[in-house]
Amino acid sequence: MGKLFLIGAGGFIGACLRYTVSSQVPRIKNIPAGTLTVNLLGTIVLAFLTFSSEPQSMVYLVNIGILGSFTTFSTFAYETFKLLEEGQNFSFFLNIFLNVALCLVGVSIAYLALSL
């Protein structure tokens, strides 16, 4: 039961943070920058926590709870599909590229920073 409480509490925090951050970041040339921002921030934090040693309770609270609800693949997929549906082909491909490439760069930065 303790695990579920930590995950649920973290989920509440992450969802509130996601709403706050993503609603404050405007679209940039049709790119849903709010979703990109939360996914990039969440990826970097998750990478730092994963590559460092942390107690299992932190995994439940932060990695699964907070970051699981803070980041959002489903919104990324929906917003990207909407770009395609609206005929925004360049923005469609750019959004995919930015989300994947920047998040991979974020993981790499965290890994390299902790390897020094």
UniProtKB/Swiss-Prot annotation:
The GO terms this record gives for MF are: fluoride channel activity; metal ion binding
**InterPro entries on file:** FluC
Where, per UniProt, does this protein localize?
A: Cell membrane
List the transmembrane segments: 1-21, 31-51, 58-78, 92-112
Please give the activity regulation comment for this entry.
Na(+) is not transported, but it plays an essential structural role and its presence is essential for fluoride channel function.
Give the record's keywords alphabetically: Cell membrane, Ion channel, Ion transport, Membrane, Metal-binding, Sodium, Transmembrane, Transmembrane helix, Transport
Q: Which Gene Ontology CC terms are recorded?
A: plasma membrane
Q: Which reactions fall under this protein's catalytic activity?
A: fluoride(in) = fluoride(out)
Q: Does the keyword Protease apply?
A: no
Q: What is the membrane topology here?
A: Multi-pass membrane protein
Q: Does the UniProt entry include the keyword Membrane?
A: yes
- Binding residues for Na(+): 68, 71
The Gene Ontology biological process terms listed for this entry are: cellular detoxification of fluoride
Q: What does this protein do?
A: Fluoride-specific ion channel. Important for reducing fluoride concentration in the cell, thus reducing its toxicity.
The family note in this entry says: Belongs to the fluoride channel Fluc/FEX (TC 1.A.43) family.
Annotated NCBIfam families: crcB (TIGR00494)
Protein known as: Fluoride-specific ion channel FluC 1
Q: Which organism is it from?
A: Methanosarcina barkeri (strain Fusaro / DSM 804)
